[in-house]
Amino acid sequence: MVQWKHAALLALALAVVGCSSNSKKELPPAELTDFKEEVVLSKQWSRSVGDGQGDLYNLLEPAVDGSTIYAASAEGRVMAIQRETGDVLWKKDLERPVSGGVGVGYGLVLVGTLRGDVIALDEATGKKKWTKRVNSEVLSAPATNGDVVVVQTQDDKLIGLDAASGDQRWIYESTVPVLTLRGTGAPLIAGNMALAGLASGKVVAVDVQRGLPIWEQRVAIPQGRSELDRVVDIDGGLLLSGDTLYVVSYQGRAAALDVNSGRLLWQREASSYVGVAEGFGNIYVSQASGSVEGLDSRGASSLWNNDALARRQLSAPAVFSSNVVVGDLEGYVHLLSQVDGRFVGRERVDSDGVRVRPLVVGSWMYVFGNGGKLVAYTIR
């Protein structure tokens, strides 16, 4: 309960002060400026998914499998929607608060709850297949390979569940710092490994069948005198491209690791709690300060930096066509050129804000607003 209070307070502090622990008088979010519009988004459909992210700092992300997009709201509504027409295929009200999701694949739709439950629904019908109590909040999407479901809890446990029954197969535990951000990155399954970023600033790989450690690598080293200064959570999730794993921590570093060994390929100073994207041979980072930066994926040199969205609480970036896309606290999605970071487009989606990464599938982009609005776009 102590950690819950600290984490909730820290999340609130980050929202209020624009993720800076040192400023005495904080500046307001940067005002949006005019630019020459080069890319225009075309809205294809819009649907309401319950209360969206709810009142807590949830990061409920939609997921696509085939022709269907799945989304969940904080109040417990889960929906399956035909991703090109917007037709609702099914909806399920779980009658309990959802805090992590959505994971999808191998016939399962997976969410986690504030009460520490993992719930598996049938992908085709929405019928509940099983529920498993894991005794800690689940704040990110579970992952599955069809045999094992891997869950990361708020107290940085990785838990392997049987995909058919929900029975626990293994548990991997780590030491949690005194103070952490509210949230965890979603675990990632790659071959025989389950990968996760931890609140300690480490990335770990464990055997997906047994939960035994394969390797661990520290990405960020806690520094500073106060517990707040020493927060180095990896909350933005991991990005796997070929054999390279990209990761970024809060108040730490962006880094590239060899996924097979955990060997550090490169690193550079960065601070982000939302993660990275890849495109054009580059890595894109939404910094905690509100700047968006393009890095060379081979050596981490900075290619460009756009700081015009300072203190606007940006979402994780996504790559859509030749553009980098981020959402912000006022519900805008901003499109930046991958080449030089200049603004090329802007669209307001949800006046309650856009906190989660836009989801891109081919020529379609799906944006889930904090208020529950799920909107599908193409480029005009």
UniProtKB/Swiss-Prot annotation:
Cystine residue pairs: none
Compartment annotation: Cell outer membrane
One BP term from GO: protein insertion into membrane
Membrane-topology annotation of the record: Lipid-anchor
Keyword Lipoprotein: yes
Covalent lipid adducts (N-palmitoyl cysteine), residues: 19
Lipid group attachment sites (S-diacylglycerol cysteine): 19
Main location: membrane
SMART domains listed in its UniProt record: PQQ
Pfam name, any one: PQQ_2
Keywords of this entry: Cell outer membrane, Lipoprotein, Membrane, Palmitate, Signal
Signal peptide: 1-18
InterPro entries according to UniProt: BamB (IPR017687), PQQ_b-propeller_rpt (IPR018391), PQQ_rpt_dom (IPR002372), Quinoprotein_ADH-like_sf (IPR011047), WD40/YVTN_repeat-like_dom_sf (IPR015943)
Gene Ontology CC: cell outer membrane
Function per UniProt: Part of the outer membrane protein assembly complex, which is involved in assembly and insertion of beta-barrel proteins into the outer membrane.
Subunit architecture: Part of the Bam complex.
Family membership: Belongs to the BamB family.
HAMAP family, alphabetized: OM_assembly_BamB
Listed name of the protein: Outer membrane protein assembly factor BamB
Gene that specifies this protein: bamB
